[in-house]
Amino acid sequence: MPHKRFVFILAITSLFNISQTIHAEPTPLSTLEEKKLTLEQQLGKQLFFDTNLSSPPGQSCASCHDIKTSLTDVIQNSPVSLGTVTGRTGTRNTPSAAYSAFAPGFHFDAEEELYIGGQFLDGRAANLKEQAKAPFLNPDEMNSPDEQSVINKIKTARYASLFKQVFGEQILNDSKKAYDKVAQAIASFENTANFNRFSSKYDYFLAGRVALSKLEQKGLDLFEDEDKGNCAACHTSKTEGGSQPLFTDYTYDNLGTPSNPEILALKGADFVDVGLGETVGSEENGKFKVPSLRNIAKTAPLYA
């Protein structure tokens, strides 16, 4: 039995490893046209990497969504991510921003009687644009006191003229409208091939361009077998309508996972992360969105 368990784990791990991006040839499936950024996407990139938009300065979106670790936190020995204020932390590990643009808008499926989509593990942001607004004002993240303070910094940023070129000469005079455009530009950047490469070995395998090793194929078989791993029941691995698989169905599940003692040590013994329940009501306590398994070999730690 121990030997079979080891083979199972090794096979599944091999499957996860093939979902990593291949940095050498062959040429990525995304086209060269997708890599050319519009002016709005260029602005979104500037905002995404601007470390001056936190208070105190020093943290940007890219600080916690680093390309080296598939757009998640580079700090892999902590169960939570660090904020710009020394000593402050979030309550979860940073989720990957890769492929997040494909999540459907947060909604309740009356037929299936469950919640689907949205951003964050608890679905508290309806879409990518709304998600982009949150970290700037979160005291445990970028800690800006209000929207106006963010816009004031943008007024003196090197890309202020680009902001006006994209959204109008007077846009920065209205902090509420300007802040909405900040989120729009970041979401637009996150919709580019920079975040959605679809260039893993598994993508090339689906396109018929490479073959899986015997161990990788065994991992895939276990992953999809309803009587064995059945991982694909939630982490979809098939192409649908010509689209590449995203390894999530964007639903919310309660797996009965106990509280992480490392998080309790930081947040207090009484801390409880109720997940979706915080967003829609206590009847959904303990449910969290099914995460994508793309690039999972790079996105540790693998607990919320």
List each language-model region with its residue ranges.
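Post-cleavage N-terminal segment of exported redox proteins
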Residues: 2-47, 94, 134-139, 143-226, ...
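Short glycine/threonine-rich turn/loop motifs
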Residues: 25-131, 199-304
